Amino acid sequence: MSESLAETAAAAENEEQADDSMEKLVFDEEDEQMVSGEDLLGGKSLIMSDDSEAEDGSQEKPLSPKDRRRRMMDSDQEEDAMDQGNGDSIKNSEDVEEEMVSRPKKKVSAIIDSDNDDEQQAEKKTQKEEGKQPVKSKKKRSQVNQEDQEKPVKSNKTKKAVKNKTQANKAEDDQDNPSKEDKPKKVVKNKKQTNKDGKPQTNEEYDHHQQHEKPAKTQKSKKLAKKQKQQEDDKEDNGTEQEKKKPSPKSKAKKSDKSKIDSLMDNEEDAGEDLKMYQEDQEPQKQKTKKSAKKTNKDSKEESGEDQEHQEQKKPLKKIKLDNIDTKEDKEQIVKPKKMAKKNKQKVLSDDESEENQNEKVDQDHDLKKMSSENELEMGSDKEDQEMQEPPKKAKKNKQRMDSESEDEIPKTESEKITSSPKNKLKGLVDSESEPEETAEEVSPVKNKLKGLVDSESEPELDNPEESAGEQEAPMESALSREKPKKAKVVRESAKKALEGMQAIQSEQQRLHREAHINVPYHQPKPRTLKEFLSRRTINAPLATALAGGSPMPSRQPRKSVGLRMTREELEAYAKLMEDRAKEATEFFKSESESDEEDDSENEEPMELKDNPGVMDEMLDNPKTPEQPKNDTEDMTSQAVIEVPVLGEDKTDDTVGDEAMVADSITEEEPIASTSTAAALKLADNFEIQQETNAKSPSKVCLVTEVVELPKLDLSTINITPSSKPATPKISEVIRQLKIEKSLDESPSLKGDPNMVIDLETGDMFAKKPTGVDDLLNRLMKTREAKKHKTTETVNILTTEHGKLEMSKVSIHLHEEEIAKEPKPGAGYMKMQEHLKTLITKKRMEDLRKKQAEEQEKMAEDEEEGMDVDEEYEPEDKPGYAEVTINEDEEIIDKVDSTAEDDGDAEENKNDADEDPEDNPVEDSEDEKNDSESEQECEANPEPETQTRKKNRIIKAFEDDNSDEDDLDLLQTPKPSNVAPITATQLQLSAHKLFDVETRRTASDEENELLDLCSGQFPQTQMLSSDAPSVDTAVISQIPMTQFGGSSQAADELEGLCSGTFATQLPSQAPTQQPEQQEESEVPAAVANRIVSSDEEAQEDALEVDKPRNKKLTKKRPKKKAKLGFSDDEDSDDEVEEFDEESDAEPVEEIPETFVDYDSEENEIVVEMTKKDRKIRAANFVDKEAELSESEWGSADEDEKNMDEYDIELGDEDQFDRDKLRHELGQIHARKMMDQDIREVRKIKELLFEEEEEGANRQRQFRWKNVEAGFSLDDNRTDNGEGNDGSGDEENEHLWRKIRYEREQLLLEKGLKPEVASPLSTSVINTSNNGNSPAIRRLNIISSKKTTVEVKKNSPFLISKTIAGKQQKSAVRGSFLIRDQQTLSKLAGLTKGTSGDVDAAEGTISVKSAKAKNFVFATLTEEEHENRKRKAADILNSSTETGVNFIKKPKLEPRRDKCLIDQLL
């Protein structure tokens, strides 16, 4: 029977496919335009089942136990009706076998009419009315057939659920076919697998698989066929009527429901995303329940149509059935908004008719259920949007559709809410569709949910025709996938061809869908520039925000407290503000794809957005929605407007409405992204509300979620108009608001002078207080102003002395006044110096012109001889001038002695001649004079302190006149005679040069001196030549030229200066050098000394040279000496040359002497050296020593061949890690520092511990390390710890004498002779006497350690017990290291043993002090001495912790006398 049924079903299917192939092609086009909600939701929602059922489902609540019992009773009644219907259908079963084959595939095909002409006529009518009903009917047929196939398995699930009214009927089915329920489960499982694969090949395989399993189902399907035959007969009569009636109520319901859904969507957008995942999990279970309820409701209504009692109920149920069909068609025709409106209208009407037989409590449940279902469906719309971006995944979408249907049809029980395994889902799917007996109460939740799904999908789809075209493809594919598993019984050629054609069409659709451009209605904001963002009204008008109670800086001053106390007026203003802000936000943040959607959505949304909170509250509170659908929507809009003021009356309700509006406006800014979060939160709220009484305001539940969301809102952009009366009675709030208003009246800006300071708290500006840095800078600027040397200023003076007005110009020196105002140290002195310099130079020029006119000839002759040399050094001369700045004071002093100054000038000229051999002698003298004058003028300012310093030196030189004169006589006797030859013309020329040089003079005279010294052009063989650089200073020192009295002296002196002092003239002038160098033979030692300490001795030399010239030259010499300090090397070379010349002059001294010298390998060699050579060696000694000390690095191998070449080594190529090296060096350094710190800490500890001992603050216990082992000092103190306590022996010397006496007495009593210690003591004494022996050196090192470590008090070591007891209080611990050698020698002797052991056998010493603190040596009995003798000897001969042996054996010490190092030193 089952096989025949399968064959007939396949045949019927093939015929249907042949007839409807063109219809399906049309469907495909429509499906391309409409992707179903399931497609996009990922199988979590239904495919577009009936809108009327969704409408009813929206008003239903989860079943309570009472409802379940009631529905079971109803199901029993309906089972009787079904039995009757089955009896009728059995009669017609044979006639309808072909018809039955399609039923497993499409349940509604029987109801609507796939093979019936009447139903086809009805379909045609609905096609004419709705435009695309054939597509829907075919889709519905596939769904119905699937549901019929899945009916047998559904019974198990509904039994567990105890929710369904058809339990009894299923029980019969289970008894008849106990094994048939398991197989359909497998079949459904396979079907789901095929859907997962989403490939037509798998569908064909599944068809073959079903062919084997169909025989088990056919028996069940026969009963169902009979039932459905009856249902068909009944519905054929009423189908056309229903279809005629449908359009108008549908449109009405559509309008009302559309408005409801829009308002709900707007309200639910406010909710957060917290419950989104939870709702997505819950959604399939809800949909299962609703689907099953829907199907059972349909079947029960059809069967009750057979009963005469329920005949009246049959028509509404059939209407609902047809409405479902029509609404399915409308769902795929979402592109047509007008028909959507009709569909919603009919949904509402069908809901009203179906729920006339139900209680008001069920109606309230429906309301809540409806809201939850619509929330889910809104979430579904979001998922649609997400999955629209994945067109290539159509196969998965088909699988998801199947899953969603199966999940929707599984009844929702508390235990099964979480079960989502595919087997259970598919089993529930089969069961839900095998039970047509479920009550109408269960139909309504499904209707509601599906209606919400349709609406939520329709909103984006209405706006996006392309998207809807894409969405239509998915329902078609799902229908095909449903058809294939059912029809694959006996596949004919025509059926196969039709399948292949359908697959080709489907693949083409998928290809087109993949390639199609889909406008995803996600929030894709338009790209905005920063200027556009910043030019928004909410940003540009922060003042209005603050005035209205919002905070421009919400992070600093949140205004929540003000919002809680909003008055009604404020609330209205706030609502208006929020509306404006929402409009602005929606316009600004509108996505690019939204521009087209706006026009359609405006037509379909009859209510304004501001009313959405009211709509939500009304729908939650109003139980009459199913009965008055049309009026409800209108009432909702009206009540929404009224509800805002009502909320405003209550303080807590204020915030509810306020925040609800805030949420609305903000969700409008993000219309799509927020739907899922809003739906999630709404659904959670509805779950809470469902079990609460209606008295509780649902908006308060919203408040919880809204308050959670509020911190995320940008409250700074909310513009709220200021309230007419204070927002809160609290004064602090008013004050704070006033402050904010005041602060916001002005746009923040910084104004004012740069010297002003702005108080950021008050905004006041005040003058900046000058800081210490500013004061310092001001003072510095004043000093800089003072340096503007306004020497003179011309002032016009008008006088009327002689009766007429006369104007006289007077130049006033303002510099003195400035100095008086801002006194600078030495400024007045410097000015006086400058003034005096000018006077002196003028006077000198006059005197020189007079006096030198007579001496001009003689000077010309003398200086012609040195002219060549002068010209050579001319460039060096001028820097020299710049250097010698400071001797003006002396010149002022020297002004008195004109003759002495003449001599000084002459000598200056000589020195200049030495330094500048290329200059004419006349020019040199003039240069000297002019240099002195110019330096007086120019260098007075920069070097006042140096002048004073030089002045002091000059005075000192005057004191030493006698000794200096003697030295100068030796060196420069002819100097005074050189002054005469200088002529006035020469002086004038030098003066001009001086003024030219003046510009080059700076305060950096020392640098110029250094350059002169390093120039290497100064004569280096004589004292004078070494001082020659400073001759410039002498020239500059402005010696009065009137002092050139002795011309003969000047000539001799000039000859002496020029006689070979220059290195360049050594060969030519050697003969003239000879006599002078003989005189200067005594000088070399002094020269060497000068080289060593250039400053001081150079000063003395200068004084010596200056003396014959009278004080003038002495000034110049100090300057010269400063230069000498830089030229040690040159001086040494000069001295060498000097010595050479002296040796030439003194051949008598050249008798060689033999000396022992060392070569580079330190081999001794005998060297013969004359006195001159020794002097040269002595002169060069410093340089050689410097080389040894690596100041001039050299090696012994330098002289060898090729040793200066660089040999490449492998180590040169190594590249070291700098960080690693740095780290290692740091570690080494840290260890060294740590060791040093430890040593220092130990020293400090020792010092502190010693001090604390006396006060008994710290008890220090010095014990013998091992009392039995023998003698070992355990003194923790370091050697340096007691270095400051060296006064102990001196303080307690009388005590030591007493102790020493007692010790000697004790030794005599014991029979120990002090002579025993004599060998050691004598050896120590001998070594101390041998000052050169290395042995002494060692003992000296030891003694130095001992001397550094001293003790405050000397402890009495070797005394009798009685004496030790007496001296315990005064005795202080100590170490042997502290004792002097005499004491140690005695102690060493005492430790050698008793009278029996005089032969230096050593005994041990043990401590027997009363306190461990006391460091006392006690005497031993003879027994103890004998027992410990050997150990003590070992320990005493070993070194202690300090590394010092207390006893040195005498046999080692004689060797120390043989060391040679000490003899050499």
Curated annotation (Swiss-Prot):
InterPro entries: Claspin (IPR024146). It comes from the Eukaryota. This is Claspin. The lineage of its organism: Eukaryota, Metazoa, Ecdysozoa, Arthropoda, Hexapoda. The gene is Claspin. Phosphorylated in response to DNA damage by IR and HU treatment. Phosphorylation does not require mei-41 or tefu. Its main location: nucleus. Belongs to the claspin family. Residues 1-12, 1067-1076 have a biased composition (Low complexity). Residues 154-163, 217-228, 336-346, 1109-1123 have a biased composition (Basic residues). Residues 1-490, 544-566, 585-636, 845-977, 1058-1154 are annotated as: Disordered. It is found in: Nucleus. The modification Phosphothreonine is found at residues 693, 973. Required for checkpoint signaling in response to DNA replication stress; either resulting from normal embryogenesis or induced by the DNA synthesis inhibitor hydroxyurea (HU). It is not required for the G2 arrest resulting from DNA double strand breaks induced by ionizing irradiation (IR). Necessary for the timely phosphorylation of Cdk1 at the mid-blastula transition. May have a minor role in maintaining genomic stability in mitotic cells.
